Amino acid sequence: NGWAAVNIRAVAAACGVSVGCIYNYFGSKTELVSAAVESIWNDIFRHPEDEAVFQDTLSCIQWMYRQMEYGCPQYPGFFTHHALGFVQQDTAGGKQQMRQTWQHILDALCSVLRHDAKVRPDAFTEQFTPEQFAGILFSLMLSAVVQQSFDPSAVLEIVRRTIY
């Protein structure tokens, strides 16, 4: 039912329990939404059966874009709501949840960049680190989500020209 259904009363009704039962687990709508967001990100970026996607940066990016493309119809409005909704929240908890969720993706990208045997030895420096490049790649990924454009070919070419 979309994001409108992610509230204490709707979840209680869907589960056939009292509102108080839901409040035993979630103290506020923000906590409930945060748990839903984390669960959805975990579903979209669940660990792939084929570990080869983490062997090189190009394979990882292709996999990430495929997963985002999968996630859009599975969870309509999720990406734009999460990308924009938590940023606009005044609550520190919502912003912290967003940072934690995204940090997991950034950490995975950094790990792939560091272990990718195809990366030129001089590709990264003190002024241009794997963390910075992962941040750039992640920004491009968020842009793709907002635009609903899941063709990674331009991003793949940027990777080839920048670090290979």
Task: Name each model feature, range by range.
Residues 1, 25, 43, 67, ...:
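Amphipathic alpha-helical interface segments
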Residues 1-31, 35:
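Helix-turn-helix
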Residues 3, 26, 82-90, 143:
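Short helix-capping/turn signature of helix-turn-helix
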Residues 4-5, 120-128:
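Short, charged helix-capping/linker segments at alpha-helix termini
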Residues 35, 49-74, 130-134, 156:
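Hydrophobic alpha-helical connector segments
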Residues 38-45:
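Short, basic, alpha-helical segments at the C-terminal edge of helix-turn-helix-like DNA-binding modules
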Residues 50, 65-73, 81-89, 112-113, ...:
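Helix-loop "lid/cap" segments that line or gate small-molecule binding pockets
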Residues 73-77, 81, 90-119, 128-131, ...:
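Amphipathic alpha-helical packing segments from all-alpha helical-bundle domains
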